[in-house]
Amino acid sequence: MTSMIGQLHSVVIDAPDAHALATFYANILGMDVKGSPGDDWVVVTGAGYRLAFQEAPDLQPPDWPDPDRPQQFHLDIRVADIDEAEPKVLALGARRLPGGGGDFRVFADPVGHPFCLVWDA
């Protein structure tokens, strides 16, 4: 094992509206939003980790699974019951994407970034 140089501070996600996308993920993860509408940097905290959202007005979101506009990252979000979780994320503005398997389903957040709901199959 190598020695630690530093610790992960946050995962930063680009969005045309940082506060709106932060609120989307905070609602899914049961976390708190630190920032206000119109801020160009908004943080979501809780559960021992943080996500940050930075305004990127010219963001060209990925178009899963199009290789010409591939994902830059994706989050795997563990859920206890996929059939209960899916309608909730859809109601928050997610949309279902092609793909998935016996223990995950693929979605896009309101900006177009893919994320997966995963569960123990």
Question: In which residue ranges do the predicted regions lie?
Answer:
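Short beta->alpha transition motifs characteristic of CBS
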Residues: G99-G100, L117-A121
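Short, acidic, Ser/Thr-enriched surface-loop or helix-capping motifs
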Residues: D109
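Short secondary-structure boundary/capping segments
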Residues: V42-V43, W64-P67
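Core segments of cupin and vicinal oxygen chelate
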Residues: T2-G6, V12-L51, E55-P57, E84-P87, ...
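A short, acidic/glycine-rich surface segment
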Residues: D58-W64
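Mid-chain, well-packed structural core segment of small domains
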Residues: P67-V89
